[in-house]
Amino acid sequence: SPDFSMYLEMAPVMQLYNVFRNRWCGAYWASKGIRIIPTVNWGNEFTFDFCFEGIEKGSVVAVSTYMASEHDNREAQKEWFMAGYNEMLRRIEPEKIICYNTPFPEMQGNIVPVDYERSSWRYMSYDVVSGEKIWKPLKQVAQRAVIMIQ
């Protein structure tokens, strides 16, 4: 599902709205037969009451360490990320966790790392699985990604 990020400084109503948009898009696409891997985001501990809602227990989920690791490497961001991550593990008990960017060593679970830069729009013509620089239809690339996580 799309990454509608939640930031610590966001107003609570905007955090709730971003969770709603994430789940709505995922539900809509699923109703059209598209396999959905929900992206999980959280803010501070007050968001834990709603940010994990609507995600099936034991499912495959996606998270990103990018904002917690690439911006001034602030320790507070890593602590915030790990608090939400551990709460996500407790509540959702995901089968697999697709992690965009480098996982932190403390992260537990069945983690499938994905290179953040190579998965960005800049590499839409770059096959992240084989390393080939040829254009492939998005559907074909997505099918290969699903095979990798199975």
Regions found by a protein language model. Name each.
Residues 1-125:
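Eukaryote-skewed repeat-based solenoidal scaffolds used as protein-protein interaction platforms
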Residues 109-150:
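C-terminal accessory extensions appended to soluble enzyme cores
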